């Protein structure tokens, strides 16, 4: 049973997926920091000092003691996170596909060289065909 699990865990797809999840988690933190610490303050400065992360709408109900808050600033920030992450992934996949296409084009362009031995075998074949006519 341990051997089967070890074979499963060491297959290329499982290891690649694990590496992708770890890198994705770290990349998510970088993008979140970019949005929180760079983009949102600049956007707030441009729009007159608005801090989007704390932007919210408070609704006071008739019968409730506790007001309801809609944290739309945090929602806007999460949308920016998503857009930056998805665009970055799109660019990365596009770059990978470009390299794959170049490799495929190079492989297609390569014409296999015929060795001297193959040339001689071809000549012998042609001579035998002529002789058997």
Curated annotation (Swiss-Prot):
Localization of this protein: Cell membrane
Transmembrane segments: 8-28, 30-50, 73-93
Pfam assignment, any one: MscL
GO molecular function: mechanosensitive monoatomic ion channel activity
Alphabetically ordered keywords of this record: Cell membrane, Ion channel, Ion transport, Membrane, Transmembrane, Transmembrane helix, Transport
Keyword Ribonucleoprotein part of the UniProt annotation: no
Bilayer disposition of the protein: Multi-pass membrane protein
Subunit structure: Homopentamer.
Stated name of the protein: Large-conductance mechanosensitive channel
Gene that produces this protein: mscL
């Amino acid at each position: 049973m341990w051997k089967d699990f070890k074979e499963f865990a060491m297959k290329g797809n499982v290891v690649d997926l694990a590496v992708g999840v770890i890198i994705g988690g770290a990349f998510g933190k970088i993008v979140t920091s970019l949005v929180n610490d760079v983009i949102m303050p600049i956007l707030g400065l441009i729009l007159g000092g608005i801090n989007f992360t704390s932007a919210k709408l408070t609704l006071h109900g008739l019968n409730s003691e506790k007001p309801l808050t809609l944290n739309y600033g945090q929602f806007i920030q999460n949308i920016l996170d998503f857009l930056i992450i998805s665009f970055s992934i799109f660019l990365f996949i596009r770059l990978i596909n470009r390299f794959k296409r170049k490799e495929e084009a190079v492989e297609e362009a390569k014409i296999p060289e015929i060795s001297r031995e193959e040339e001689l075998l071809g000549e012998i074949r042609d001579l035998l065909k002529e002789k058997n006519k």
